[in-house]
Amino acid sequence: MITRSLGKNGPTVGAIGLGCMGMSDFYGPADRSESIATIHAAMDAGITLIDTGDYYGMGHNELLIAEALKGKDRDRVVISVKYGGLRGPDRSWLGVDTRPAATKTFLAYTLQRLGTDHIDIYRPGRLDPNVPIEETVGAIADLVKGGYVHHVGLSEVGAETMRRANAVHPVADLQIEYSLISRGIEDEILPTCRQLGIGITAYGVLSRGLISGHWSKERTASPGDFRVHAPRFSTENIDRNLALVEALRALAGAKGVTVAQVAIAWVLAQGTDIVPLVGARRRDRLSEARGALTLSLTPDDHAAIERAVPRGAAAGPRYVAQQMAALDSERGRATAG
């Protein structure tokens, strides 16, 4: 597999990464055996970046990855972990805690669950409004000095926060949503990353399956699937958004590829400093996503894609209002497109 560097300070990884969240949380039940087989298939295909969060399934996701990596060469993978999200026993969200003591405590439990002596990239999942980013990054920097963490990462923060964080310790990458229908980072965040030499790991490249080509208006989200409440999947927005998908389907059909492959290839084409995370829970979906790596989009293709899905064309924001308000990356932005 072709490789990309996560910024000037980060590791070299396969050009796409595997996001494991859906194997444990937010999308309804997943088949454990198939999830593990998918992780193995990703490794066999040369995918090295494995992304998780300690709050995905309240530790379940880390334990799942540990099981998948049992007997494997630890050096074959780059493990990215988000932390700081507080969960209740009813799976509710209770806020964020990235105080230095909490940062080190969360890591201790993560190392135990994953059965490893280090995490390659450690990042707060969200900005803690009660803790200066300098204190949070300073704590991770201490963990880097101790050998427990190799690189500092960030998630869903704005340009100013990135600058402040990077002044404390070099930041490898920013994990943030980026797709054909979520392009807000192009205004200020992406240029700032490039100025600072910070890479991008892009999640939501298929907008939670909305622009995968596999979603339909008739499809019903399973119990525990957060798309039940996602604005872009709502009754008032789904028709408009699926019309965009159909426009992409026509383009994909003309090239003999799938909608998902076009959407992922578009993200890949936005710069070699961007590594898309694909949230495949099954081997067939992973195989489809990998097909984007060999899809070359011509200038005419890009122009056609822009006409089919112009920036801001999607109906609805990427999260509900309360979640959007909590995103440092969205502060000061007029729109969420």
Predicted features and spans:
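Glycine/proline-rich, positively charged
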Residues: D44, D90-G184, E188
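N-terminal binding-site loop/beta-alpha segment at the start of enzyme catalytic domains
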Residues: M1-V77, A336-G337
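Aromatic-lined glycan-binding groove of carbohydrate-active enzymes
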Residues: I185-P223, T258
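Active-site beta-loop-alpha junctions enriched in small/polar residues
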Residues: M21-M23, G53-Y55, K82-L86, P124-L127, ...
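Glycine-enriched alpha-helix->loop->beta-strand junction motifs that scaffold or abut catalytic
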Residues: N166-D173, R194-T201, T272-I274
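N-terminal small/glycine-rich loop or linker at the start of catalytic domains
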Residues: K8-Y27, S80-L94, H118, R123
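Terminal-tail/helix-coil boundary detector
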Residues: M1, Q195, R219, P223-A254, ...
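Conserved, mostly hydrophobic/aromatic
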Residues: L6, L18, S35, I50, ...
